[in-house]
């Protein structure tokens, strides 16, 4: 059985989503759209499960916000306390970069990152600012929220070269979750390391994976092994680090 809970704070979106779920729910499973906020829904759900001592089934959270507020790092930490949970976050880097220094956005950005360190990117511009923001968010998912594996997927703006439109960030606590997500995203591509958005012709494909040099990867692996204290390193350990 697969349970789907769709969450939106806009009643019109809830009605549209519920109609879509109903049209696809062939096996009459529990698929429903709720009119609430992500924060309220998550805290209510985990509060209920903790109170009754229920065993938590595997959970996959796709967080697709309008903007950059409403999904605090502290809330993601609560989700990732459970071993069989995954996060897939649409990080709207354009909006974040645009309002990085705005006073009205300061509190929301601090909640988003779980730190004030986002301000360190204030003096940067363009790709450098975006790279700093994404890097900080990924590190915070690991160090503040408790994800063991984090993978970013860059989606570029159609017709604007490598200018990122947003980043999809996957966080989990198990290597298998990372493998399945990375392999699944790659299978959606018609070319190596590319993603074709629905409704766009092949000439307007969106980049899925950031370019990766094999030579650079070899150098990174060599540096990792040279700095290792053990004489023998299990292959699984190297795979988990490099994947």
Q: PLM ranges: what are they?
A:
Residues 1-243:
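Class I S-adenosyl-L-methionine-dependent methyltransferase catalytic core
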